[in-house]
Amino acid sequence: MLEQSVLSRVQTNGATLIGVYKADGGIIGEVSYFLGHLIGVRECNLCDITHSPIKKKAKFKEFEKTLLEEHGIRVKLVHMNERTDAELAASEGREPCVLLQYPDGSISMFLDYVELKAASGSVSSFARLVESRLSIYF
């Protein structure tokens, strides 16, 4: 899925990609998002990339596994009401997005909502975005 030539050069030393959904977690948050999405008033491009209507996409699970096992990059997915203070400071008002947490704990924006929208719900397109961005950061 990810081009070996680029990521084989990436020295992450424990970096984490933190995906922030534009939805709250929990029963009320999930139902609210589902109903809003159904009638067209709620949108979360990261949700479309990571999940089918029922569960996490198999291709996304494979992508997570590849990042971790081959490149040492963890993926953490959080809802808006589940963010740490540092994650909130880096992403508030910019959801959905993907943050990059460096091994020293610092966090920066990695992919914004415009870039996530460009992936059009495709795990493969998202993987290409991540690959190209990692080659810049590391």
Task: List PLM regions with ranges.
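Short, intrinsically disordered, mixed-charge
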Residues: 33, 37-40, 65, 69, ...
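A short, hydrophobic beta-strand/beta-hairpin element that forms part of a small beta-sheet core
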Residues: 94-111
